[in-house]
Amino acid sequence: MSIWEYANPVKFMQTSGRLLPWVVAATVLTLLPGLVWGFFFTPVAAEFGATVKVIYVHVPAATLAINIWVMMLVASLIWLIRRHHVSALAAKAAAPIGMVMTLIALITGAFWGQPMWGTWWEWDPRLTSFLILFLFYLGYMALWEAIENPDTAADLTGVLCLVGSVFAVLSRYAAIFWNQGLHQGSTLSLDKEEHIADVYWQPLVLSIAGFGMLFVALLLLRTRTEIRARRLKALEQRERMA
C-alpha cells in the first residue's frame, strides 16, 4: 500500500478515526504522568529554585512550536508538488496549534527569565526568532482566512511557510550559532555541561512525549474538521448551482 493513498480524504477519515482513540489514550498516559512527576515529585533546584518546574511546559511547547512549523513545511511542499488536498488541510489545521505552543513558550520563557535574568523580555537571538515565528504563525492563519479560493490560499500559505522556515531554524539553533544573549543552551544535550540532571530530564522526556501525542491528537481532530468543512462547502456550492 502506497503512503499516498492516505492523501485520499476518504482513506484519511477512515484511518484517522481508528487511530484517534489510541492517540488520545497515549496522550493521557504520557502527558499527565510527566507533568505530575515533574511538578510535584522533583526537587527544587539549588541554582534555579522552584522556577525549574517551568521546563516541563516550556521545553515541550518550544520544541513543538518549531517542529510543527517543520511539519507544516513538509505538508505544504507535498501540496505544492503533488496537489494533495489533505496535506494542505493538515498544514492549515496545524497552524493554530503551533501558534498556541509558540505563545506558551514565550509566556513561560518570560516567567523563567524574570527571576533568572531580572527581566521579562530581552532581545536575545532565540527569543527574538521565536517572537518572529509567532508572528509568522499569525500571518499564515490570517492569509488562509483572507483568500476565498482554497487552492490559491494553499499555494500562497505554502510559499509563506517556506519563508518562515528560516526563523524556525533560527529558533532551534540560535543559542548554538550565537554565544551572546541570555538564553541557555539546549536543555537536553549530549554535552554534560549543558544537560540537566537525571532527576529533571526523565519526567521532562515524558512530558515532551505527552505534548507530542497531544499535538497528533489535535492535528487529527482538526484535519478531520477541515475535511468535513470542505465537503460541506462543496455541497452548498452544488445546491446553489442546481
Swiss-Prot record:
GO biological process: cytochrome complex assembly
GO molecular function, one term: heme transmembrane transporter activity
Membrane topology type: Multi-pass membrane protein
Example of a GO cellular component annotation carried by this entry: plasma membrane
Pfam families given in the database record: Cytochrom_C_asm
Transmembrane helix among keywords: yes
Subcellular location: Cell inner membrane
Keyword Transit peptide: no
InterPro entries cross-referenced by the UniProt entry: Cyt_c_assembly, Cyt_c_biogenesis_CcmC, Cyt_c_biogenesis_CcsA/CcmC
Keywords of this entry: Cell inner membrane, Cell membrane, Cytochrome c-type biogenesis, Membrane, Transmembrane, Transmembrane helix, Transport
Transmembrane segments: 21-41, 61-81, 93-113, 127-147, 158-178, 201-221
Main location: membrane
Family per similarity comment: Belongs to the CcmC/CycZ/HelC family.
Job description of the protein: Required for the export of heme to the periplasm for the biogenesis of c-type cytochromes.
Protein name from the UniProt record: Heme exporter protein C
Species for this entry: Rhodobacter capsulatus (strain ATCC BAA-309 / NBRC 16581 / SB1003)
Gene: helC
